[in-house]
Regions:
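A conserved active-site cap/scaffold subdomain adjacent to cofactor or substrate pockets
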Residues: 95-110
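Short, well-ordered loop/turn elements at secondary-structure boundaries
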Residues: 78-81, 91, 99-100, 132
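Short, acidic/polar
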Residues: 86-99, 233-242
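Short, solvent-exposed loop/turn and secondary-structure capping segments
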Residues: 5-8, 96, 117
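Hydrophobic or amphipathic alpha-helical targeting/insertion segments
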Residues: 1-6, 13, 21-25
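An alpha-helical appendage that flanks or caps ligand/catalytic pockets
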Residues: 16-79, 111-242
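Flexible glycine/proline-enriched surface loops and loop-helix/loop-strand junctions
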Residues: 7-14, 77-82
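Hydrophobic faces of well-ordered beta-strands that scaffold small-molecule active sites
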Residues: 1, 82-87, 102-106, 135-142
């Protein structure tokens, strides 16, 4: 809800609609970038002509969420456009990435989860008619590096002692859309229904809590410490091998 107020709304659109908005937003953005042809900038000192207007085109976008005339009032970059990076692991997020992105940033609590996501995302890319090799997948990871494994573990233990559980509870409340302060810290993680927030991270945290039988306090520590990303503790060689 707080995020919605920064975008002229009082409440979040549904999860599905947010991805519809994102897809159309990218359509508009691509039209604006592509509105400048190669050679549109001429810089003719003799005539004072900066650009070739015949090579600059309006977007003329009239969609459900955006109406944009264009053209873009600045030239596109030498490479045409920046790299498109999408973050998300829900089916809707994977579909958007498959259609539009070069890189996906995701979270995977284990190697098996990461491999499953990789297979799923690459299949979405194939279904979008793109080469699967043209989309890179970057899973988040939190490395704790030490000269020895014992030293690394000691560092990780010290960091865990500094975790602010209240902050973790705030994060869980925001992610799940439920006031987690209403539940006992040392009790089980409550079963929460569907959310219109970020669904993939909620799914990851819920499955992690069930798999490792975490209490709410322990899950809050995970949320505050690693945000649900995989933690690897060890020497530099351990982490590289992992």
């Amino acid at each position: 809800t707080d995020a919605a107020r920064n975008f002229s709304r009082t409440d979040l659109p549904s999860h599905a609609e947010r991805y519809d908005i994102a897809r159309e937003f990218l359509d508009v953005t691509f039209k604006l970038w592509n509105g400048w042809e190669e050679g549109a900038i001429v810089r003719e000192k003799a005539t004072g002509r900066y650009s070739d207007e015949a090579k600059i085109h309006a977007a003329n976008h009239k969609g459900k969420y955006f109406q944009v005339q264009g053209p873009l009032n600045i030239a596109r970059s030498p490479q045409g456009r920046p790299v498109i990076i999408e973050a998300g692991s829900s089916p809707a997020g994977q579909k958007l990435a498959a259609e539009t992105a070069e890189v996906v940033f995701t979270a995977a609590a284990s190697l098996e989860e990461g491999q499953a996501f990789y297979r799923s995302q690459k299949q979405f890319v194939r279904e979008a008619g793109r080469n699967p090799d043209h989309l890179l997948i970057l899973p988040g990871v939190m490395p704790i590096v030490g000269r020895t494994r014992e030293n690394a573990q000691e560092t990780w233990n010290q960091l865990n002692e500094l975790v602010d559980i209240d902050n973790g509870i705030e994060q869980l409340s925001a992610r799940f859309g439920v006031d987690m302060t209403a539940y006992p810290l040392d009790g089980p993680v409550p079963e929460i229904g569907g959310t219109e927030g970020g669904q993939s991270r909620v799914k990851l945290l819920t499955e992690l809590a069930a798999r490792e039988n975490l209490t709410l306090r322990q899950l809050a520590a995970v949320a505050a410490g690693s945000r649900g990303h995989r933690v690897i503790v060890g020497t530099a060689a351990d982490i590289a091998d992992d």
